[in-house]
Regions:
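Formylglycine-dependent sulfatase
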Residues: 1-173
Length: 173
């Protein structure tokens, strides 16, 4: 009997592809990512169907454009009736697990995955949809400029540290 290959899908937000011509750029200190990339199959000509995170993830998971799956912004529900690669992997006998943010809107927070190791950093909801008739109340002040980077200062906690703590807490022996 032939064993199935294991694989790990890593999806990141807002990462410029020029950082990875043949692995992480030399000036980036990413020893673990560099080691992982050197022993992996990588998609060098990947394409995202949307520059927004939730529609991009829904398209990647479903193989459908936002116009087909209805996830056109970060507040749109990703219908549980749409099969994802996780459904297909489970049908092929794989064990599936999700960790990290997905911003799934709606009751289905797994979309074919058997388990989820971490909660979402902030579930998407209709509050993510800006009201363009009220520009002073929009949430995009932190999303479309470098203010959150240049004004950040020294951090005491990060989403990564919170995820690491949660994974350690929920680790199965």
């Amino acid at each position: 009997m032939t064993s199935k290959p294991n694989f790990l899908i890593i999806m990141v937000d807002q990462l410029n592809g020029t950082f990875f011509p043949d692995g992480p750029a030399d000036w980036l200190h990413t020893p673990n990512l560099r080691r992982l990339a050197s022993n992996s199959v990588r998609f060098k000509n990947a394409y995202t169907a949307s520059p927004l995170c939730a529609p991009g993830r829904a398209s990647f998971m479903s193989g459908q454009l936002p116009s087909q799956n209805g996830v056109y912004d970060n507040a749109a529900e990703f219908s549980s009736t749409i099969p994802t690669y996780a459904h297909h992997l489970r049908r092929a006998g794989y064990q599936t697990c999700l960790s990290g943010k997905m911003h799934f809107v709606g009751p289905d927070q797994l979309h074919g995955f058997e388990e989820r190791l971490t909660t979402d950093i902030y579930p998407a909801d209709f509050g993510w949809t800006p009201d363009y008739s009220k520009p002073d109340e929009r949430i995009d002040w932190w999303y479309h400029n470098l203010g959150s980077v240049t004004g950040a200062g020294i951090g005491e906690i990060s989403n990564q540290l919170e995820y690491d703590d949660e994974v350690a807490f929920n680790a199965k022996s």
